[in-house]
Design a protein with these regions (language model features):
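PLP-dependent amino-acid enzyme catalytic core
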Residues: 1-230
Length: 230
């Protein structure tokens, strides 16, 4: 597969910690240590997405999420690091006293537009329409969905498998377990495991979609990535 370019943001490799519980051994991959203000798995995807945004000479970044979205916060801060502003399309209600991630979004200069739950169902269409309006004005907005889960973004977790392979013998690992919100982390690990010819089970614990919807999303991302970068 053709490996896309990325911008190095994350402090990697992240460490592994072993715990034992009821006679079983578990290894915890500390991706919460990728970087203080960019903590978690979000930055691995953003390294590829923002590199592509720079390549396409974007003027502004569009992305979406909840009013306390970790992905949104990480996007705003990472984009600032390379001189780009972000507009966030968030589900929830505005407040006169921002807190948590929304406070950080505002501190780092994000433009924010809020939507009701019903309106948010069409958020990708709304971002596209606003992107087209900016294009008419000579401005280039680079948009990606909540979670950064695109066929490009999941390269962050294809590379994660390569990193993990250097730390442990993955042939001795039965399963890799991760929470699954938008499916990108699991999809990337699935492709990474296949590329490395590993017989390891990828377990995605769905936290937003139904089991069936999550499975479909993961497979679509994985198959799309293979087709896009073969």
């Amino acid at each position: 597969m053709i490996t896309p370019k990325k911008i190095q943001f994350a402090n990697i490799p992240t460490p592994l910690e072993e715990i034992k519980f009821e006679g079983k051994s578990f290894l915890i991959k500390r991706d919460d240590l990728t970087g203080c203000e960019l903590s978690g798995n979000k930055i691995r995807k953003l390294e590829y997405l923002l590199a592509d945004a720079k390549r396409q000479k974007a003027d502004i970044i569009f992305t979406s999420g909840g009013d306390q979205s970790n992905h949104a916060r990480a996007t705003v801060i990472a984009a600032r690091k390379i001189g780009l502003k972000t507009k966030l399309f968030l589900w929830g209600k505005d407040t006169t006293s921002p807190n948590g991630n929304y406070f950080l979004d505002k501190i780092f200069g994000a433009d924010v537009q809020f939507f009701s739950e019903k309106e948010y169902e069409n958020v990708n269409d709304i971002m596209f329409e606003q992107r087209m309006e900016l294009l008419k004005k000579g401005k280039n907005a680079y948009a990606f969905p909540g979670g950064g889960s695109t066929t490009l973004g999941i390269w962050g977790y294809i590379n994660f498998i390569n990193e993990l392979k250097e730390q442990i013998d993955l042939k001795k690992v039965d399963s890799i377990v991760a929470a699954a919100g938008s499916g990108g982390t699991a999809a990337g690990m699935l492709v990474g495991a296949a590329l490395n010819k590993l017989n390891v089970k990828i377990v995605a614990v769905h936290v937003l979609m139904s089991k069936e919807e999550m499975r479909k999303q993961i497979l679509q991302l994985a198959e799309g990535c293979v087709l896009d970068y073969k």
